[in-house]
A protein has these predicted regions:
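Short, structured interface segments
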Residues: 68-89, 177-180
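Histidine-anchored nucleotide/phosphate-binding helix
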Residues: 212-220
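Conserved S-adenosyl-L-methionine
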Residues: 220-226
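Reductase modules of NAD(P)H-dependent flavoproteins
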Residues: 1-71, 80, 226, 230-332
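A short, basic/flexible loop-to-alpha-helix module at the beginning of a structural domain
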Residues: 183-194
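Short, conserved phosphate/pyrophosphate- and ester-handling motifs at nucleotide-, phospho-/glycolipid
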Residues: 125, 207, 298
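Short conserved beta-strand and strand-loop elements enriched in small hydrophobics
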Residues: 4, 82-85, 128-133, 176-182
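Ferredoxin-reductase
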Residues: 90-177, 197, 233-235, 261-263
Length: 332
């Protein structure tokens, strides 16, 4: 059977076993999350060997050229040698410039890049990985354009058992240095989108962040078709960024912001009901095939919403999804 050399240790790979599973089975320290190639937390560097094409296809060509691959997707059939990359090898140093609560559980985090020359290009709506001083990694969607704002904006929800968020909400301070890696994800405004295409955006919780970034990006690029923006929460207290979205609606008449809550609201502008049911009920079936959808947030919502609009007549390739699933990176 094939051997895996890692951090001065040698392990035997089981048949059809990934490098990640082998390392975890042998109690080695490596960050990981989804085990599906999406989060890219388990990035490793090959040494004097070649990783499989399948394990490399998930990452950018620039990283492939430097010998990186994903441990979760690499199933070696011969002896291999790998190592964890250092922070300096694959990340950009940033400073926390703002920590502001947007509601009781969501914080806006702004990051300044220490050396703008090192900053990578991204599109609003993609996500990047944050690496805190303890080496814990977590991925978050990007809510803005770095080129326009000269900072990176993230919206982060506090989770009771989240190692990273507990650090962020309790210990992080403005001026602290952390690192970022990215970008990843395909949920963004594509330049190939027809400028007059009808766009429907729907998200729950901090699913607002990528959608807000995508909407602004579309409008900045001269999108002239209607954009309907749904944001859902359990109650009024779970909604946020209402002033910003109303301002966007005032500036761009074709942008239509529709807040939704499960609990009844005292605000007549807020729609009451489950977000997926509200969106489905308001869609015009005769035009669904020409619409493009962006769905972000809780996986249960994203998958249900995708199924509903597809069965109603939307084209599968016009439904762009970012379910916030399996992004919690586990430090071992």
């Amino acid at each position: 059977m094939a051997k895996l050399k890692f951090q001065n240790h040698t392990f035997t790979l089981e048949p059809y076993e990934s490098v990640l599973d082998c390392l975890l089975r042998n109690a080695q320290t490596i960050p990981y999350a989804c085990k599906a190639g999406t989060c890219q937390a388990c990035l490793i560097r090959t040494i004097a060997c070649e990783a499989t094409a399948e394990s490399k296809k998930w990452i950018k060509n620039a990283l492939q050229d430097k010998g990186y691959t994903l441990a979760c997707q690499w199933l070696p059939e011969q002896d291999v040698h790998a190592a964890l990359p250092t922070i300096e090898e694959f990340s950009v140093a940033v400073l926390i410039s703002e920590l502001v609560m947007l509601n009781k559980s969501v914080m806006r985090v702004k990051l300044d890049v220490k050396d703008p020359a090192e900053m990578f290009h991204y599109r609003p709506g993609q996500y990047l990985s944050l690496i805190n001083p303890d080496g814990i990694i977590r991925s978050y969607s990007i809510a803005n354009s770095y080129e326009k704002d000269q900072c990176i904006e993230l919206h982060i929800a506090n989770t009771e058992h989240g190692i990273f968020t507990q650090w962020l909400f309790k210990s992080a301070v403005v001026g602290m240095k952390i690192h970022i890696r990215g970008p990843s994800g395909t949920c963004f405004y594509n330049d190939a989108i027809e400028k007059d295409q009808v766009l429907v955006m729907a998200g729950t919780g901090t699913g607002l962040a990528p959608l807000y970034g995508i909407a602004r990006d579309a409008l900045t690029h001269g999108h002239s078709g209607p954009i309907t923006f749904y944001h859902g929460g359990r109650s009024d207290a779970h909604l946020y960024y209402r002033e910003q979205l109303l301002a966007l609606q005032h500036e761009f008449p074709l942008f239509d912001y529709r807040p939704c809550t499960i609990d009844a609201s005292s605000d007549p502008a807020v729609l009451t009901g489950r977000l997926e049911q509200i969106v489905e009920a308001q869609l015009d079936s005769s035009h669904l095939q020409k619409m493009r959808f962006f769905l972000c947030g809780a996986p249960t919502f994203v998958f249900d919403m995708r199924k509903r609009i597809y069965l109603k007549g939307a084209r599968a390739d016009n439904i762009i999804c970012d379910p916030f699933t399996e992004r919690n990176v586990t430090p071992t």
